[in-house]
């Protein structure tokens, strides 16, 4: 949360780092946290002003990082978490939100360990399975289990996909599939 507003920032913003393909390979293939980053920034207060106090703004910044299943090279988030958060803030201030640090009133950081421990997500993956073409949309696990009779699935790791629209759609599909 902030005590100031950035009226020129839209609801969704993507800040691509200098080497997008290399960054994606570092994160998803090598399990390495790189020196550079790309960020997705969500500003819900632009479409729903009740998300922030009057005169303030609300932002969510997502920095893709390796999940915990990559082994020894995975960062120790207890050790580097705050410095990484500061690095994200510096990128935001430089590229999108000048003066953010002076107006920051609340901040919360989620790491892969948060997703693992709080949400029981395997390897701390924030959005379930990897964002590869053969794990997207139709290729995700379907809502009716093929292995266990009577098992129905909904959520970010199932068809149709991750993100709030995908999760809600998954629940709507499931509501039609489960017998009365």
Task: Tell where the protein language model's regions lie, with residue ranges.
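A glycine-rich dinucleotide-binding beta-alpha-beta segment and adjacent secondary-structure elements
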Residues: 34-42, 94, 98-160
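C-terminal structured subdomain/cap of oxidoreductase catalytic cores
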Residues: 1-6, 56, 76, 80-87, ...
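Flavin-binding catalytic cores
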Residues: 3-5, 27-36, 52-54, 75-117
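Short, histidine-centered active-site or binding-site loop motifs used for metal coordination
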Residues: 65-67, 157-158
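Mid-domain catalytic core of redox enzymes
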Residues: 1-53
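Amphipathic alpha-helix from the class-I
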Residues: 66-75
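Extended hydrophobic-aromatic, low-complexity segments
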Residues: 51, 71-72, 163
């Amino acid at each position: 949360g902030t005590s100031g507003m950035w009226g020129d920032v839209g609801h969704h913003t993507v800040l691509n780092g200098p080497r997008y393909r290399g960054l994606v390979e570092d994160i998803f293939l090598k399990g390495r946290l790189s020196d550079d980053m790309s960020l997705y920034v969500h500003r819900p207060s632009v479409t729903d002003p009740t998300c922030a106090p009057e005169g303030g703004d609300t932002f969510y910044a997502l920095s893709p990082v390796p999940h915990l299943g990559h082994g020894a090279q995975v960062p120790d988030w207890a050790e580097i978490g705050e410095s990484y958060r500061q690095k994200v803030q510096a990128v935001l201030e430089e590229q999108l939100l000048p003066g953010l640090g002076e107006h920051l009133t609340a901040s919360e950081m989620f790491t892969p360990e948060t997703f693992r421990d709080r949400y029981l997500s395997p390897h701390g993956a924030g959005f379930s399975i990897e964002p590869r073409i053969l794990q997207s949309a139709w290729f995700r696990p379907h809502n009716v289990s093929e292995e266990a009779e009577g098992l129905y699935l909904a959520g970010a790791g199932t068809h149709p996909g991750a993100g709030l629209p995908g999760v809600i759609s998954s629940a709507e599909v499931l509501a039609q599939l489960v017998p009365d």
